[in-house]
Amino acid sequence: GLYADKLAHDYGFGKRYTLIPFKGLYLKYTKNKTDVKMNIYPVPNLKNPFLGVHYTETVDGDIKIGPTAIPAFWRENYDMSHGFSLTEFGEVIFYEAKLFLANSFNFRGLALEEMQKYNKDYFVSLAEKMVVSIDPKGFTDWTKPGIRAQLLDKEKLSLVQDFVIEGDQ
């Protein structure tokens, strides 16, 4: 979760890791629920840990596209004020700036690409590539965002692709 690293640190584990939050935005398709009846994923880019924009059918039958993987500025950055912490903001910005300047794992390109997804037309164009019969005007409403808790190895300046298991004897 969003505070797993802090919890681990409190118990003396995972000191070389910190969490970098990424915001996932979604757009709801409001035109016709039958236009897409299953989850549809793009071929993943193995150079980054994110799936890319994909179609999801929700439990109530709605269709949404997303998520983005936009670097968030604090752990609970669901909107511009929710859960704001100046200390957290400083920590997150420090590591995001470090990743951006060092361009570790092409973070700069990834961040700039993801920021483009704030543009609704661009965001929808990515989904259109997978389902050409979809009406782009049907994507009307932004839904509640999610925050991905992404672990960062502070020593290697790399994202951790899997779990880290540490413990005492």
Q: Residues of each region from the PLM?
A:
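Flavin-dependent oxidoreductases
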Residues: 1-86
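Short, functional N-terminal and low-complexity linear motifs
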Residues: 6, 89-96, 157-162
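Residues that form generic nucleotide/phosphate-binding pockets
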Residues: 10, 92, 126-130
